[in-house]
Amino acid sequence: MSPYFKLSSALIFLAITMEALCSPIENTSTSNKDNDKETEHIEISAKPSGISRGALGQGFEIHREDLLSKQFEATGEKIFEDLPMDECTVTTTLGTIERDDSFYNSTESLYQSVASSTKISGSLKGAYTLGVSVAAVTNNIASSEEEVQGLSLNLKAYSMSSILKKNCVNTKPLSKDLVSDFEALDSEITKPWKLSSWKKYKVLLEKYGSRIVKESISGSSIYQYVFAKSSQKFNHRSFTVKACVSLAGPTKVGKLSFSGCTGVSQQEIEQSSSQSMIKKLVVRGGKTETRASLIGELDPDQINKFLIEAETDPSPIQYKFEPIWTILKTRYVGTEHFAKAVNLEQFYKGFLHFGCSYLHTTSAENKVAEMQKFDFAKTSDPDAPTYVCKVGPEGCQHHEDCHYRAAFWCECGGPYDLARTCFRHKFKKLKSGLTKKECYPNKESGFAWHGCRLHGLTCWCSAPNRSWEESWSGEDTNNALNDVHQVLMEKKRRDNAQQQY
C-alpha cells in the first residue's frame, strides 16, 4: 500500500469524523406543538423489503418534487452501479403509533418543518428547494406574497427505518453513467455569473438529482392539513377545530382517537363551517388500494384500520436525504475532479437556491451597470473554488445618475431619473425567514450625493463607489474535506516535482 494512499485514507477518515462532530445541530422543533404526543405500541410482523425501503439510494431533484402532499414514488435516478440492500442497510423496527398536531405560525415555520423532517439543511429551507412542496400542501397560497398559518393533525404508524450504511455510500461503485457525466464537467468556470457557463452542471442535476434518499421510514400515516392567510387572523383553536371536522366530518369528530378533537363543541363546529381555509388530506404508506379508498371525510374505524396496516404491509411514509455533492466530494478528494464536486455544491446553493442570477440594467444612453453577479471569492483556490454572490456598489455609476438640486446639492437617481443606474441596497426578508441583500435602481427622492459631486451648478459622478458587497458566500460551505483535498493536492505537486529531478 503506497504512503500516499495511507495518508489520503487517514485524512479522509479524519475529515468525515470531524464533520460529523462539528456539524451544527439543527433545531428539529419545527412548529409549535401545544398538544402532547400520544403514543401506542404495535407489533411489527413485516420484514424489510423493496416495498418498505422504497426509493432508498435513488437520486431526486428535490426542488421539483412534492415532498408533502402525495405518496413519494420510487422513481428516482440510479446513483450506484450496485447497492445490495441486505448488505448496505441497517433496519430498525419501530412499532409505534403517534398522534399529535403541528401548528405553523408562519410560512417560515412550514418551510422549517419540511427541512427538518427530510434532513435538508436549514440554509436550503427556502422557496427554490422546497417551494413545490409548500405550494402543493397550501394550494399555492404560500407561494404568493401572503404569509400563511395553519395546522396539521398527524397520525403516524411507524413500522421500520432503513438507512444506508455510510461505508456503502462511500465505497460502493457509482453508476457508470454518473461517473462519466460527472468527470466530463468543466473544472474551471470562466464566467460563473452566466447561467450558460453552468449548463453541464444543470443538466447533471436535472438527470441525477441534487440528493439521494439516505433513509426510508415505512409504515402508514394520515395528515390533515388546514391553512389560511395570516391576515385572516384565525387562532390555534380555530385551525384545530377545522382540521378535526375536515378529517372526520361534523358528526364523528368526537370519535377520533385524538385528544385535540375530543372536546370540540357543536358551537365550534358551526363556527368552523363559516371559516374559509385550505384543506388537504394526505395519506401515505400502507397498502396502495387502502390509500386509494381514503378520500374525503374518514370514519375513525377506517383510520385505525389503515394505521394498523403498518404491522403487516408498511410502505414509505417519510424519506431523509443526503446531498449528491457530499458523496462526490468524498469519492474524489485528492483528485482533479474534486473541484467539480465543489462547483456543483456552490452552484446549487449560491446560484440556484439563493437566487444569484446575473442582474444588470441599462442607462438611457445604453450604458450597462451590473447589479448582481455570481463570482469567485477573492480567496478562491482553483483546487477547491469558492464563490460569492455580489451586489453592485451603492451610488452613482455614470454621470447621468447625478442631478443638481436647489440649495447646492446633488441627488443620485430619483423619481424623474432616466439613467436608472444609481443603485441602492435593501434587505428583503424571504419566506424562509432568511434575509437577502438586494441591489436596485433608486427611484426615491432625497438620495443625496453617493458619489455625485457638485461642479458649479452641475453634478457629476466624480467619486463613484467601486466596492461590491457580498450577499452570500460559499466559504460557509467549506468543510474539512476541502482542507484534506488541499493537503493531498499539495503533496501530489511536491511528489511530481521531486520525480522530475
UniProtKB/Swiss-Prot annotation:
Residues 135-159 form a coiled coil. One of its GO terms (molecular function) is toxin activity. Residues 388-422 form the EGF-like domain. Keywords: Coiled coil, Cytolysis, Disulfide bond, EGF-like domain, Hemolysis, Nematocyst, Secreted, Signal, Toxin. InterPro entries: MACPF. Residues 1-22 form the signal peptide. It is found in: Secreted; Nematocyst. The keyword Ligase does not apply. Residues 23-35 form a propeptide. Causes lethal toxicity to the shrimp Palaemon paucidence, and hemolytic activity toward sheep red blood cells. This is DELTA-alicitoxin-Pse2a. It comes from Phyllodiscus semoni. The lineage of its organism: Eukaryota, Metazoa, Cnidaria, Anthozoa, Hexacorallia.
